[in-house]
Amino acid sequence: ENGIATGKYTNTFDVVTESTTHHVDVNAGLYFDYVKGLDLGVIAGYNYWGVKENAYAWQKPSWKVEFTGTYKFLEKWEVGASYKMLADRKALVAGEVVKMNDIHDVDVWASYKALDWLTVFIKGKNLANQKSDTYYGYRNFGINGIAGVTMLF
């Protein structure tokens, strides 16, 4: 077990605090919507985490990239797909710096607008079935999904 014993419980990472954190998030994006119904986008970003009391902003990504595409057709249908990468994350485990695996998330979805106020949707998540930690020691679900309705009031 990679945990840190604290009495009868085990934590998977150290809990630390930072009295002042400065966060600068620089992003650049390109969007394409020239074809009717088709929207494509790519966003890349860098996060600067200014910390003084810790070596790093633990478990926070320095780099992120996201690709998204949606297509609307027959007035009521929409399908889409996305890819998101979060990179350069570090965790503090038992006093040691541990480089965390990058997150690569692939999702697809579809929705149908049944009424002006009612939409039915389904979404498949983590289709690459990546076993990465959202937080150190907290593994994400494998392939999973969600289905539901959205109602506007």
Predicted regions and their residues:
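Outer-membrane beta-barrel domain signature, especially the mid-to-C-terminal portions
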Residues: E1-H23, G45-E66, K84-K113, L127-G148
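Residue-level signature of outer-membrane beta-barrel architecture
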Residues: L30-Y34, Y46, Y71, Y112, ...
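Gram-negative (and chloroplast) outer-membrane scaffold detector with strong preference
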Residues: K64-S82
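Short C-terminal domain-edge/linker segments immediately following a structured domain
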Residues: K72-W77, S111-Y112, G142, T150-F153
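Non-catalytic surface loops within mature trypsin-like serine protease
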Residues: E75, M85-A87, D116, N126, ...
